[in-house]
A protein has these predicted regions:
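C-terminal-of-GTPase-core extension/linker across diverse P-loop GTPases
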Residues: 1-8, 16, 84-86, 90-151, ...
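Conserved nucleotide-binding/hydrolysis micro-motifs of P-loop NTPases
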Residues: 21, 85-89, 156-160, 189-191, ...
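Conserved C-terminal guanine-recognition region of P-loop GTPase G domains, centered on the G4
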Residues: 67-70, 87, 162-180, 205-212, ...
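Conserved phosphate-handling catalytic cores of large alpha/beta enzymes
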Residues: 249-268
Length: 524
């Protein structure tokens, strides 16, 4: 190696396996592993890749920062630099290896330079002990209950405060998907980097921190284009998903009805189809765990034609659901029952309000996107006036277009509403952001013309003076779905609204909703 280095006047490096076999020969200072090597020597659950890199250089200089970055980024067993003298003799050897996560916060250790011929290290024993230490440290930092862990990343032109706020929401989404968040990173950029969203250097830093902290994946708050996702996966074998994929995974968990499952699978396939091209073995990194619940790896690793065929089949099935929905809607219209739909940001308390108003028992856990399938219940007022209360999927900022398209039949229920009740979580950190996000989605769905009332929920968690100020400012009604006495003003206003519609109730009809009665006496 020393002789060849002198002849070509360029550094020469070799990647060696633990058996001492040469895996790759690299000319120059840039260390990039081929896709074949990346595939054969994945880190997976191991702490190290099983490769060490030794390179010559024409000057007696210590390890560069670039070399140390490569060590951490590629999870090499060891990296060594051999100084080649002008007469062809080998001078000092510079070595470095990774360190377990600890109080020092250091990623690697640079050993003291020694003459090459004085090297006495037993590499097999050294690597075995090092990997044992790394595995032990990883076990200490591991997340319990078999949950996956993630580093969250935001890269946008928004202020640091806005990004941090959005990362809080992303963390809530991750928690809803069963992921434990162990770190967050925010990078302000004037424009998203075309290749990696972040610059290549910053992207390496993110991946190094992910590896060092033992995280299973990186979750981006921004949607990654197919080209960006492909470029990132060419750099690493860490699982990488974006916010859209995370939301799709949550929807896959929450879908219970056949219609809901079809809509989620359709959204997932539409999202993944443009990301299938040219991925080869990297596609398998989408398999299993968060970001892939629903269609499954086997289905996605078929050819694009079969995926398109599946999409076509799901679209036909949804069209059938839509026809059935139209028939139900027509029957309901014949009975003349007004429809009031609950809309709002996810986890604002819509299902809880539905349960209290109609004495129902739909799931209303305190987590994002708890409700996915549409639920309709009958609310009966005194004097035998009735309305249908409908609870639908919650909204979120930057709602993925794949979901908007796939859930068209569900969202079409809102078009038939006589009145929308926009539920807002009064205790939310970013109440105005959530309110604006929902209003924007309603406008996108062309629902601006439907009458709607603003309800500020969870007023029991906010000082009464603040409730009064906010309700006056936005023209809202303050309620707490958990405090029935606060619902009296809403109930009175709803009854007056129904009376104004002059709807005559036909109590002999057989509407396909459950029948519950709510009177003033039950609220006293």
């Amino acid at each position: 190696m020393a002789q060849l280095t002198l002849e070509i006047r360029r550094p020469l490096g070799v990647l060696l396996t633990r058996r001492g076999q040469v895996q790759e020969v690299i000319v120059g200072t840039e260390l990039t592993l081929s896709s074949t090597t990346m595939t054969l020597f994945r880190t997976g659950t191991r702490s190290l890749r099983g490769l060490r890199f030794v390179r010559t250089q024409l000057h007696d200089q210590p390890l560069s920062q670039e070399a140390l970055t490569d060590l951490a980024f590629l999870r090499l067993d060891l990296i060594g630099i051999l100084a080649v003298e002008e007469d062809g003799r080998i001078g000092n050897l510079y070595l470095a290896h990774l360190l377990p996560p600890g109080s020092t916060g250091q990623l690697f250790k640079v050993l003291k330079a020694i003459p090459f011929h004085n090297l006495t290290i037993s590499f097999d024993t050294f690597i075995e002990e090092l990997e044992a230490d790394l595995q032990c440290a990883r076990a200490l930092h591991a997340v319990g209950n078999g949950k996956e862990s993630a580093i969250l990343v935001s890269a946008s032109a928004k202020s640091r405060a806005e990004q941090e706020e959005q990362l809080v929401e992303l963390a809530e989404l991750a928690t809803s998907a069963g992921v434990t968040v162990i770190g967050r990173m925010a990078q302000r950029t004037t424009d998203g980097h075309q290749r990696y969203l972040l610059g290549s250097g910053k992207m390496k830093d993110v991946l190094i921190q992910t590896l060092h902290r033992g995280a299973d994946m990186v979750i981006f708050d921004q949607t990654l284009s197919p080209a960006q996702l492909r470029a990132i996966l060419e750099m690493t074998d860490i699982k990488v998903i974006d916010r859209t994929q995370l939301i799709l995974d949550i929807f896959a968990r929450r879908a219970h009805s056949r219609e809901g499952k079809v809509q989620v699978e359709l959204a997932q396939l539409r999202y993944l189809l443009p990301r299938l091209s040219g991925r080869g073995t990297q596609l398998s990194r989408l398999g299993g765990g968060i970001g892939t619940r629903g269609p499954g790896e086997t289905k996605l690793e078929t050819d694009r034609r079969r995926v398109r065929d599946r999409i076509t089949h799901l679209e036909r099935e949804l069209a059938q659901f839509a026809r059935h929905q139209d028939q139900r809607r027509a029957r309901r219209n014949r009975y003349g029952l007004p429809v009031v739909s609950l809309v709002g940001y996810t986890n604002a308390g819509k299902s809880t309000l539905l349960n209290v108003l109609t004495k129902s028992h739909v799931s209303a856990q305190n987590r994002l996107f708890e409700t996915l399938d549409t639920t309709s219940r009958r609310l009966r007022f005194p004097e035998d006036r009735e309305i249908i209360i409908t609870d639908t999927v919650g909204f979120i900022r930057d709602l993925p277009q794949e979901l908007v398209g796939a859930f068209k039949t569900t969202l079409d229920e809102l078009r038939e509403a006589d009145l929308l009740l926009h539920i807002v979580d009064m205790n939310a950190r970013d109440i105005e952001v959530q309110l604006t996000a929902v209003e924007s989605i309603l406008e996108e769905l062309q629902l601006s013309s439907v009458p709607r009332w603003l309800l500020f929920n969870k007023c029991d968690q906010v000082p009464s003076q603040q409730v009064e100020v906010l309700c006056r400012r936005f023209g809202a009604i303050g309620i707490s779905a958990l405090e029935p006495t606060t619902l009296r003003p809403l109930f009175v206003r709803l009854e007056a609204y129904v009376r104004s519609l002059s709807v005559e109730d036909d109590r002999t009809s057989h509407v396909t909703v459950q029948d519950y009665e709510l009177t003033f006496s039950s609220r006293r």
